[in-house]
């Protein structure tokens, strides 16, 4: 589906756009390595791979019902004519409502996806609504395959920026990579 991934995203990484920039100031490489070791152990415990083909994922969306997540901050960084959407741990429904109210037709430079890429916070409707080609997922676990399935079905030529290389560890079957 032509979705590329970049990792790790560490302090010192910069993204520039028309006179503006985003500079990543954390996490430090050492912190990332500690967490990466934990992830590696989790993967070893699970046999080192995630069985199941992404093309056979059952896509049943169950919305996040947490009041604290519903109250999570949704913010937009604006510089000149560029905008980056930060969604915190908010719900898909709240993000769609906020974007419809304040930025109904806006193209964002990037969107930081909510709640570590949780399938309960990322619906197909949200993926369709967010007008961008670059999404950030920050998580210390593997992203649920159903979220990647939703992206594959709803978006083309999308770049997912991740802080870990979880997908390189036999996460996909050969068919799932296609």
What is the predicted function of each stretch?
Residues 1-23, 103, 131-178:
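Binuclear metal-ion centers of metallo-dependent hydrolases, dominated by the metallo-beta-lactamase
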Residues 32, 47-52, 99-101, 111-112, ...:
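Glycine-rich loops and low-complexity Gly/Arg-rich segments
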Residues 57-133, 137-138, 143-146:
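Active-site-proximal loop/helix segments of hydrolase catalytic cores
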Residues 53-59, 123, 163, 168, ...:
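Serine/threonine-rich low-complexity intrinsically disordered regions
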Residues 29-30, 91-92, 167:
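Short, solvent-exposed loop/turn segments at secondary-structure junctions
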Residues 1-83, 158-159, 175-178:
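Flexible, acidic/histidine-containing loops and adjacent segments that form or flank the divalent-metal
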